[in-house]
Amino acid sequence: MEEQPRERSEAGAEACEEKRGLSQAAEERIEDRISLLLRLRAQTKQQLLEYKSMIDTNEEKTPEQIMQEKQIEVKIEELENEIEDVKSNIEMKSLALSRMKLSVALRDNMENMGPENCVLTDDMKHILKLQKLIMKSQEESSELEKKLLDVRKKRLQLKQASRSKLLEIQIEKNKQKEDVDKMENSEMIKTMKKKLQTEIKITTVVQHTFQGLILASKTNWAEDPALRETVLQLEKDLNTL
């Protein structure tokens, strides 16, 4: 009879060692992933610093450069969120591993206890029950954190899409302005402006001539509505039209 508790204890210890080995391997994989993410974040930040130093040498940033800079910043933020998520998972798994070890130890002690220790046994059962509830709550919390991370990623994607759209609009406006400037500075537009100024000058001379003729005729043009309208039209400055 004494050999059975000992065998159970040894089996529990072996199971605990096996779980510990699997958990350690999982932790090593997660730590490798964190190291990779940290290296990627450092490389991305370095690229951003180099990019900014190159841009600072210019007097003004182009919309394309601003867009690339914002994309790098969004990528850094995504990496930081992913690192925080991995760290949180490691902490959760470490706590779960500790509780598994404690559960195995408590179970072994309960099997070795006699009837006289029933009160302590009940306490241990209650502790194990609480541990299961805690682990369940932590799993639910982990799921909520994953959902929160997904929401953050979607928010970043929307922010990036909004910035990209605004930059596209700005690029289009700048292009239209450049096209207008090119048209205004083109030889055809210059020639048309010269012709227009010549026509304005000729028309102004004609206006003054008609005004002189009307005044020289000593006609009371104010009493004639049609003539009054003509005189008022002749007084307009064509350069302001």
From Swiss-Prot:
GO biological process assignments: chromosome segregation; kinetochore assembly; kinetochore organization; mitotic cell cycle
Crosslinked positions (Glycyl lysine isopeptide (Lys-Gly) (interchain with G-Cter in SUMO2)): 61
Locate the region Disordered: 1-24
Is Coiled coil one of the keywords UniProt gives this record?
A: yes
Key words of the record:
Acetylation, Centromere, Chromosome, Coiled coil, Isopeptide bond, Kinetochore, Nucleus, Phosphoprotein, Ubl conjugation
Compartment(s) where it occurs, according to its Swiss-Prot or TrEMBL record: Nucleus; Chromosome, Centromere, Kinetochore
State the family it belongs to: Belongs to the CENP-H/MCM16 family.
What does it do?
Component of the CENPA-NAC (nucleosome-associated) complex, a complex that plays a central role in assembly of kinetochore proteins, mitotic progression and chromosome segregation. The CENPA-NAC complex recruits the CENPA-CAD (nucleosome distal) complex and may be involved in incorporation of newly synthesized CENPA into centromeres. Required for chromosome congression and efficiently align the chromosomes on a metaphase plate.
Q: What is this protein called?
A: Centromere protein H
According to its UniProt entry, this protein's organism is Mus musculus
- List the gene name: Cenph
